Amino acid sequence: LAGGLTEPRPADTEIQEIANKVKPQLEEKTNKKYD
């Protein structure tokens, strides 16, 4: 299935950098904190 979900795996450096950029925006919009 193209575009389907994959098994969770540790984030590589590129993925972690993206997550670090969007996390503050997500927290601000949802008024929640994520670890």
From Swiss-Prot:
Cited InterPro entries: Cystatin_dom (IPR000010), Cystatin_sf (IPR046350), Prot_inh_stefin (IPR001713)
Q: What SUPFAM superfamilies would the database entry show?
A: Cystatin/monellin (SSF54403)
Region Disordered, as annotated, extends over 1-35
Name the UniProt key words of this record, in alphabetical order.
Answer: Cytoplasm, Protease inhibitor, Thiol protease inhibitor
Q: Does the keyword ATP-binding apply?
A: no
One Pfam family this sequence matches: Cystatin
Q: Where is the composition biased (Basic and acidic residues)?
A: 24-35
Where exactly is the site Reactive site?
G3
Record's GO cellular component, any one?
cytoplasm
Where, subcellularly, is it found? Cytoplasm
**General function of this protein:** Potent inhibitor of cathepsins L and S, and papain.
The record's comment on protein family reads: Belongs to the cystatin family.
- What's the protein name? Leukocyte cysteine proteinase inhibitor 2
Organism name = Sus scrofa
